[in-house]
Swiss-Prot record:
Biased composition (Gly residues): 74-83
Record-given protein name: Large ribosomal subunit protein P2
Residues covered by region (Disordered): 74-114
Stated role: Plays an important role in the elongation step of protein synthesis.
Length: 114
């Protein structure tokens, strides 16, 4: 990510085709280590491509990736109502109970005297 950030900073600074030395100097300015392999890979992947098209393509791909966190989504869908945080707080408790129940169903407990 730091190599990509350095590349984008170079572009924002007006450098239309940053070199590996440009990226290394940007990374060195903030005390970050420069990985030559990652820099070369990035430069080879973006060579001759428009950065705005690459970003748009990346956004489309990220939009199609399913994301976890159903509790966060449910809380966000609440629209800021006062009950949303309470509902989100109750969800993990229900999951913990089901895990305990599943252990009991298997007849396995860490604290059995058997």
């Amino acid at each position: 990510m730091k190599v990509i950030a350095a590349f984008l900073l170079a572009l924002l600074g007006g450098n239309t085709s940053p070199t590996d030395e440009d990226l290394k100097s940007i990374l060195a300015s903030v005390g970050a280590d420069a990985d030559d392999d990652k820099i070369e890979l990035l430069l080879s992947q973006v060579k001759g491509k428009d950065i705005t098209e690459l970003i748009a393509s990346g956004r489309e791909r990220l939009a199609s990736v399913p994301s976890g966190g159903g509790v966060a989504v449910a809380a966000a869908a609440g629209g800021g109502g006062g009950d949303a945080p309470a509902a989100a707080a109750e969800e993990p408790k229900k999951e913990e109970k089901s895990e305990e129940e599943s252990d009991e169903e298997l007849g396995f407990s860490l604290f059995d005297d058997n």
